[in-house]
């Protein structure tokens, strides 16, 4: 990364960092060095470079192999606060630097100008990690056989990559010799533990067996610059097309202070058959028993090849590496190729961290699992592998990072190698941090307060939903990344010659990313519209059924109303009406016969009985008193008439007349005992009023009803 040197003007650097926050500090520092701290020249150059980081497809202008190697450098080193200063950029940022390298071989920041490591993370100038480190201090405290972790192994620096126990030295393949060892200045404050993880892509896609890469951090020195670095590289398939790019315009200074002793990287145990024996020392057979055991060779069918290390997306791999004591932003949006990490509204929090959490007993483990690929994604969800000793970052962290862009994508400026049959798609990494107790800082670096902790990082393919969530997070961030078509960006992305690949050649990948994002957006919109259309169709069908039901009910009501007015009676109804009519006629005939029978018996006049009270005079006219022999006859006749009328109302046949006659005969028989002396006979017989015919008590002289006198 870019180190602060006396040639840099801190004020100009600060102004440029404020003006171009999307450009990493290393690139800004290199621009200042090239332009001799000229603010205007740096502004012009950085304004041209800013779009590369805005559209997140940065590549070196002379890098004609942008699809081949995408180096992801995960820095796990620790540093002391005294060595931290703002000019160091990502070198002293707590060891969490993601580095984009255009080099093709092993990581060699000083081997050639084109192999400089470009800072990918722009770290804020916050409180650095507080670590008390010694020159020979190994932060991972992992012992080899009969050798302490703090003792530097006696390995000559002529081997840039050395395998330890568990490697099969004859399993390496590839003719490319190791690059010359880099020269670094030794700063004893740093304890470097390099972990170079290179995963191979040129594996047959039919293999689905899980493979594991075990990395044992037992060497307290670093080959590649920053302390405790982990480099994850994806390179192309053909080694014939390996080219060393020319000097990049933004060259960075050496990665970090590295001691010259023990130039051995951490061991890699993939148990495969494609290694370079020239790059790995067979004498490192000193750790037969390690803290972690890799699976047998049958389960690890060569996931890695030495010259070009790429991972097949459809296969599963495991990488075990120790954690770093620093923290990372929770949701930064970053992509690997542009060497740019968007800070947005998130800031990197540096939490105080002491070496006590990295003591021997507290050996922590990070497990990186590469899952089978689901679909080509345009961004990866990368989460922080390092941890902090505070419980604040124990939740799920998600970063969106894109490594190598798909080599099968259109308008990609590649001329020196054939296109692979599959595309190198971004990797989707999720990080789950265990919920164990946090390490308590202690003054002694050897004190262990917590047991072994395992950190799992799952590497898979980014799905559509992940990109949608990424867009949602970008909407909530301070500076969302614009997506513009290729027509907006100057230069054509379809150029095939590497000499034409200037700054504007990133427009091809921009156009591809824009196309992918547009397709994803349109697909999501189409799905949403299809769902809405389905709901509308269901609602339409429901309304149609309701309308049909209402129309049917209306028709039924109309039919019932019409049938009530003009309906022809049924034969049953006609028969019923005919029988009722016949019954009425029978009743009328019976009534007439009864009337004729009663009329033939005497002075029974129904008309006179109905109008009886109309013939009564209004005044107290006393009728002439009837004779004694006829006095009883009217009463008897009247009683008979009353009884006959009542009987005729109840019975409606001819036999009623016989019953009436029998009743009349019975009445005559009942009147015969009344003639016998009873109590009433002593008082006298009741008398009928001549005016109102009311039957009065014999003791009364006036009528009880009309007050007419009994006798005139």
From Swiss-Prot:
Tissue: Widely expressed. Constitutively overexpressed in certain tumor tissues.
Keyword Acetylation: yes
One of the record's GO cellular component terms: endosome membrane
Ranges where the record places region Disordered: 141-189, 227-345, 369-447, 475-509, 609-636, 658-682
Subunit comment: Interacts with TAB1, TAB2, MAP3K7, TRAF2 and TRAF6. The minimal TAB3-containing complex (TAB1-MAP3K7-TAB3) appears not to contain TAB2. However, it seems sensible to consider that TAB2 may also join this complex and may act in a cooperative manner with TAB3. Interacts with DYNC2I2 (via the WD domains). Interacts with RBCK1. Binds 'Lys-63'-linked polyubiquitin chains. Interacts with TRIM5. Interacts with TRIM38 (via B30.2/SPRY domain), leading to its translocation to lysosomes and degradation. Interacts with ASB1. (Microbial infection) Interacts with M.tuberculosis PtpA, which blocks the NF-kappa-B signaling pathway.
Domain remark from Swiss-Prot or TrEMBL: The RanBP2-type zinc finger (NZF) mediates binding to two consecutive 'Lys-63'-linked ubiquitins.
Name of the protein described by the UniProt record: TGF-beta-activated kinase 1 and MAP3K7-binding protein 3
């Amino acid at each position: 990364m870019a180190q602060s040197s006396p040639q840099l003007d801190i004020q100009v650097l600060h102004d440029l960092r404020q003006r171009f926050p999307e450009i990493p500090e290393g690139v800004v520092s290199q621009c200042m060095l090239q332009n001799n701290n000229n603010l205007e020249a740096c502004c012009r150059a950085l304004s041209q470079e800013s779009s590369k980081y805005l559209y997140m497809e940065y590549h070196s202008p002379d890098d004609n192999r942008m699809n081949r190697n995408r180096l992801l450098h995960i820095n796990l080193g620790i540093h002391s606060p005294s060595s931290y200063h703002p000019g160091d950029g990502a070198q002293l940022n707590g060891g969490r630097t993601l580095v984009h390298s255009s080099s093709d071989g092993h990581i060699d920041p000083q081997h050639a100008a084109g192999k400089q490591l470009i800072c990918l993370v722009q770290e804020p100038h916050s409180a650095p990690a507080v670590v008390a480190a010694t020159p020979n201090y190994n932060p991972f405290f992992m012992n080899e056989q009969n050798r302490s972790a703090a003792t530097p192994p006696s390995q000559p620096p002529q081997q840039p990559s050395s395998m330890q126990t568990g490697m099969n030295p004859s399993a390496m393949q590839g003719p490319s010799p190791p690059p010359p060892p880099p020269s670094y200045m030794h700063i004893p404050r740093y304890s470097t533990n390099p972990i170079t993880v290179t995963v191979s892509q040129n594996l047959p896609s039919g293999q689905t067996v899980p493979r594991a890469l075990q990395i044992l951090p037992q060497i307290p020195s670093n080959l590649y610059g920053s302390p405790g670095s982990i480099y994850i590289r994806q390179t192309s398939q053909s080694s014939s097309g390996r080219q060393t790019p020319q000097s990049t315009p933004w060259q960075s200074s050496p990665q970090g202070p590295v001691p010259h002793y023990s130039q051995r990287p951490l061991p890699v145990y993939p148990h495969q058959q494609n290694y370079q024996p020239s790059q790995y020392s067979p004498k490192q057979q000193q750790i037969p028993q390690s803290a972690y055991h890799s699976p047998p060779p049958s389960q690890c069918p060569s996931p890695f090849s030495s010259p070009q290390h790429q991972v097949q997306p459809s296969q599963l791999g495991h990488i075990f590496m120790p954690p770093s004591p620093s923290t990372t932003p929770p949701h930064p949006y970053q992509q690997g190729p542009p060497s740019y990490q968007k800070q947005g509204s998130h800031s990197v929090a540096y939490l105080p961290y002491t070496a006590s959490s990295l003591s021997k007993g507290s050996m922590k483990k990070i497990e990186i699992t590469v899952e089978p690929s689901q679909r080509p994604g345009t961004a990866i969800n990368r989460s922080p592998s390092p941890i902090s000793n505070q419980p604040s970052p124990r939740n799920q962290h998600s970063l969106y990072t894109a490594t190598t862009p798909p080599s099968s994508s259109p308008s990609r400026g590649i001329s020196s190698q054939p296109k692979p049959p599959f595309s190198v798609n971004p990797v989707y990494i999720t990080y789950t941090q265990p919920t164990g107790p946090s390490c308590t800082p202690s003054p002694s670096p050897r004190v262990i307060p917590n047991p072994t902790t395992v950190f799992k990082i799952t590497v898979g393919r980014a799905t559509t939903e992940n990109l949608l969530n990424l867009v949602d997070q970008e909407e909530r961030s301070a500076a969302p990344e614009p997506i513009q078509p290729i027509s907006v960006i100057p230069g054509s992305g379809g150029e095939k010659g590497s000499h034409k690949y200037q700054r504007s050649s990133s427009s091809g990948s921009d156009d591809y990313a824009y196309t992918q994002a547009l397709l994803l957006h349109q697909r999501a919109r189409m799905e949403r519209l299809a769902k809405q259309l389905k709901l509308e169709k269901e609602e339409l069908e429901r309304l149609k059924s309701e309308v049909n039901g209402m129309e049917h009910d209306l028709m039924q009501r109309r039919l019932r109303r019409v049938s009530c007015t003009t309906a022809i009676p049924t034969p049953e109804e006609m028969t019923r009406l005919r029988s009722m009519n016949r019954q009425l006629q029978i009743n009328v005939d019976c009534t007439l016969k009864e009337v004729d029978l009663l009329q033939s018996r005497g002075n029974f006049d129904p008309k006179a009985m109905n109008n009886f009270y109309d013939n009564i005079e209004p005044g107290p006219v006393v009728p002439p008193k009837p004779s004694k022999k006829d006095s009883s006859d009217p009463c008897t006749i009247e009683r008979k008439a009353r009884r006959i009328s009542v009987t005729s109302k109840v019975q409606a046949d001819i036999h009623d007349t016989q019953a009436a006659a029998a009743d009349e005969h019975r009445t005559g028989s009942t009147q015969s005992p009344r003639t016998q002396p009873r109590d009433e006979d002593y008082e006298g017989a009741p008398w009928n009023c001549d005016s109102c015919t009311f039957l009065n008590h014999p003791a009364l002289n006036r009528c009880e009803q009309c007050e007419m006198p009994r006798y005139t």
